[in-house]
Regions:
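Extracytoplasmic beta-strand/coil segments of soluble accessory domains associated
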Residues: 112, 140-185
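Gram-negative outer-membrane beta-barrel transporters
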Residues: 82, 95, 481, 489, ...
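Membrane-embedded beta-barrel scaffold of Gram-negative outer-membrane proteins
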Residues: 260, 265, 379-385, 391, ...
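N-terminal periplasmic "start-of-domain" segments of outer-membrane beta-barrel proteins
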Residues: 81, 88-93, 99-140, 159-163, ...
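Structural signature of Gram-negative outer-membrane beta-barrels, strongest in the C-terminal barrel
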Residues: 418-434, 459-597, 681
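Transmembrane beta-barrel wall of Gram-negative outer-membrane proteins
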Residues: 239, 246-275, 280-319, 357-373, ...
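C-terminal beta-signal and adjacent terminal beta-strands/loops
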Residues: 32, 543, 686, 697-702, ...
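Short acidic/polar hinge/loop motifs at secondary-structure boundaries
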Residues: 185-211
Length: 788
């Protein structure tokens, strides 16, 4: 950590920047709550809301004082508001409608004064229209409407890697280095792997993203931040909904939603079936998802939330294309240039058709959250879930893994005072454990994915336990100092037995037992003297421990063995930001960040085909994130998100066939430099007719360490027209929502994702497996019917 401490001068520079920014803002700051999406409120209305907020806050405090002086038996029952409470484990939902922080109906002792989200963080959330008007294939377009986040196509229809501020950039499949939640239930397994296969866009109300290292809040693997998916409530559905859509390349989707809210219950259940032939050859799939949610208000003090999700996925997987293949035919299955003999195992074969590359995966999560109001100022939350992943994946080798995972956390949140200063306190504890049972077989490359000889069987466990605390002190009116600290101990145990690939006889064993202890401090300063402006500076840290496979190769020889020298990867995030409502119709968010990455875990070739995981000493990422939301007239919304990242290695020697090469000053591969999303949407409420036009731009960036081969830039345009029909005189039909959408309207040829590759020259790099092609022009249409 000494290298990280050495960069403290940046903290002073950012503090000076904060002062300049505050002076420029003429004494106004934005409230911490996620911004309302209705900027049309008049200044008088906003002033009245602020007055009401302050009056209710003072009444609340007087009532608490009066009740605290009574004997317990004489105190009234505490009534908790219906709004969902969320802990730092599950970042709270961002309000997307024009709802005041306090309403006349919220005359309860427990009000929204309780912590709804941490102070001093970069937080953005999608509005419901991002998913409501385009419930088609994936979450990519709606999530990239937020600044700082990039999604890349991976191995499946909804399988995307996620990058935030450069973290997660080298992940070629699934999600790593970023924590994923849905409705407060953790989706990231204990080994740090998340997949978006379970997230169906039609189920979602919004997506929230916390950007920047956040391990003090979300523990292991939160190097880039946190993503929280919010499903629709029963009150949003209010009956039965059916959904159908279809489109290009054989796409078809069917869905049903059932939901209702009563005085004590809110129940919502979703189910969907999706199938497609695919744009790329050998990418056809079908997937089914069920998502069940029950929220139960047990009494005035207690709430319970139950969630069950299951997803079945059967998808073919193409191979990434070389540059030449991509330029010739971007829709080919890939891997034809590799050495393959039908009926014979070859670890270097990547012909997706001969290997019959596929994923047959199932994942189920069942969990619950219990919340109890202990007193007027204290809330206890306890979460527990069971998460099991069962996979069979065929590539050059065939993998069969089962990963049962048990996860739980408990926390206490308290709103109090330190002297006369408001103080919000949080303390939490968590524990989770995952087992992995796996077998690896040869793939005989006969076009059917036939298993050959057993190559390896393995057994592994990971056990994480830790705690954290956080204090947010309003030491001066509208100035909030937040400090937090997290600690986690992780124990990994993995044993693998390897077999000879020719005879199938026992070859060798490899095992590792490692214990890692990590600390994650965080601090921030926020200034928000009004509801329209907010400024903050933040210093936060993240960490991620090695994966099982990282520990089973000797770093000196590359042979099977124990990697005793591998360390957790860590980062330090420094940021300064502002969120400003420059006009009742215009909201702007700007954040600058500087992230130092230490001991990144990478794979290097030691000799021949022998590889091992090592730590790259240090790199840095700096950039700016900009978001704007303008509503000049009723029904019209103009929004945009821009992210710029400049990255480079600070101290890194790369091991190549020619020896060690110093990469200091080189750009970190696969980190985009410029990402821009812009959208213009208009909805004419009297007619129920709306439309939007969206553009996405990605600049070029390097994919290899020597910076000789790059990812091509692109511009993509999408258009959508939708119609909402309300039916008022029928007991069978309530509404119909119809949409037609055209993606990539110009039929641009582009790469949806690249991956980190080796090779010193452009020619050496160009011959590797690099690109997945993005979809050509595609037309989709669909209808949602509200019944009963």
């Amino acid at each position: 950590m000494s290298e990280l401490v050495g960069v403290s001068r940046w903290g002073y520079a950012m503090a000076v920047g904060m002062f300049v920014l505050c002076v420029a803002g003429n004494g106004k700051a934005l409230a911490q709550d996620a911004p309302s999406s209705d900027p049309s409120a008049s200044p008088r209305e906003r002033a009245l809301r602020d007055q009401l907020k302050n009056i209710l806050k003072e009444l609340d405090e007087l009532q608490q004082k009066k009740e605290s002086e009574k004997p317990d038996a004489e105190r009234p029952t505490i009534i908790k508001e219906k709004a969902e409470s969320a802990s730092p484990e599950a970042a709270p939902e961002a309000t997307s409608e024009a709802t005041p922080d306090f309403d006349l109906a919220d005359m309860s002792i427990v009000s929204k004064r309780h912590q709804k989200r941490p102070e001093g963080i970069s937080l953005s959330a999608t509005v419901p229209s991002e998913t409501d008007s385009q419930p088609t294939r994936t979450m990519k377009e709606s999530m990239e409407s937020l600044p700082g986040i990039v999604l890349r196509q991976a191995n499946g229809p909804r399988d995307f890697s996620i990058m935030i501020r450069g973290q997660g950039a080298k992940t070629s499949f699934a999600v790593r280095d970023i924590k994923i939640y849905e409705d407060g239930i953790q989706q990231t397994q204990s080994d740090g792997l998340s997949r978006l296969d379970m997230q169906d866009p039609w189920f979602m109300r919004s997506v929230e993203v916390i950007r920047g290292a956040s391990s003090s809040l979300y523990d292991n693997y939160a190097l880039g931040g946190m993503v929280q998916f919010r499903t629709r409530r029963g009150r949003d559905i209010h009956g039965l909904e059916t959904f159908f859509s279809g489109g290009s390349f054989g796409y078809q989707k069917y869905g049903v939603a059932i939901g209702q809210e009563t005085e004590r219950f809110d129940v919502a259940m979703f189910g969907s079936h999706v199938a497609e032939d695919g744009f790329i050859q050998h990418s056809n799939y079908n997937t089914q998802t069920i998502n069940f949610n029950v929220r139960y208000k047990m009494d005035g003090r207690q709430n319970f939330y139950f969630k069950a999700i299951t997803n079945w996925l059967n998808t073919k997987v193409p191979t990434r294309l070389t540059q030449g293949q991509f330029l010739t035919d971007e829709r080919q299955a890939g891997g034809a240039q590799t050495s393959c003999t039908p009926g014979t195992y070859n670890g270097g074969c990547a012909n997706s058709l001969l290997l019959d590359q596929s994923r047959v995966d199932r994942r189920t999560i069942v969990g619950g959250i219990y919340e109890r109001q202990i007193d007027a100022n204290t809330v206890l939350t306890v979460e527990a879930d069971y998460d099991v992943k069962d996979i069979q994946q065929s590539f050059s080798q065939i993998f069969e893994n089962t990963n049962p995972n048990y996860k739980s956390y408990a926390d206490l949140r308290h709103d109090g005072r330190l002297g006369t200063m408001p103080l919000k306190s949080y303390v939490g504890f968590f524990v989770n454990m995952m087992e992995q049972k796996g077998n690896t077989f040869q793939n005989l490359a006969d076009g059917f994915g036939t298993k050959g000889t057993l190559l390896q069987n393995s057994r592994a466990t990971i056990f994480n336990i830790g705690g954290r605390f956080r204090e947010e002190l309003e030491f001066y009116p509208n100035w909030i100092l937040a400090v937090g600290l997290g600690f986690e101990q992780s124990r990994l145990s993995v044993h693998a037995t390897n077999y000879d690939q020719t005879t199938g006889a026992f070859a060798n064993r490899a095992s590792a037992n490692r214990t890692f202890s990590n600390w994650a401090p965080e601090g921030s300063l926020t200034w928000k003297p009004s509801a329209d402006y907010r400024y903050w500076i933040r210093a936060s840290t993240g960490y991620g421990i090695p994966q099982f496979a990282n520990l089973l190769r000797d770093p000196v020889t590359g042979q099977p063995g124990t990697n005793f020298s591998l360390k957790p990867q860590k980062n330090l995030n420094l940021e300064i930001g502002t969120e400003m409502r420059l006009h009742p119709t215009l909201l702007v968010q700007v954040a600058g960040f500087y992230t130092f990455f230490k001991d990144e875990i990478i794979t290097q070739v030691i000799s021949g085909i022998n590889t091992a995981s090592v730590n790259a000493d240090s790199s840095r990422y700096r950039g700016v994130e900009v978001f704007a939301d303008w509503r000049p007239v009723s029904g019209l919304r103009v929004s945009g998100a821009y992210t710029h990242i400049d990255s480079e290695y600070i101290n890194f020697s790369d091991r190549t066939a020619a020896g060690f090469i110093v990469r200091d000053g080189k750009h970190v591969p696969n980190v985009p430099t410029d990402i821009l999303n812009g959208k213009v949407e208009y909805y004419h409420a009297p007619m129920g007719l709306g439309a939007w036009v969206e553009g996405n731009y990605s600049n070029s960036y390097f994919l290899n360490n020597n910076n000789t081969f790059g990812f091509p830039s692109y511009v993509i345009g999408n258009v959508n027209v939708y119609k909402n029909i309300e039916v008022s005189n029928s007991s069978w039909f309530r509404f119909a929502k119809l949409f037609v959408q055209v993606d990539n309207i110009a039929d641009t040829k582009y790469a949806a994702s690249g991956q980190f590759i080796s090779g010193e020259t452009h020619a050496q790099a160009a011959g590797q497996q690099i690109f997945f092609a993005g979809y050509g022009r595609a037309v989709y249409g669909g209808v949602t019917l509200g019944l009963f």
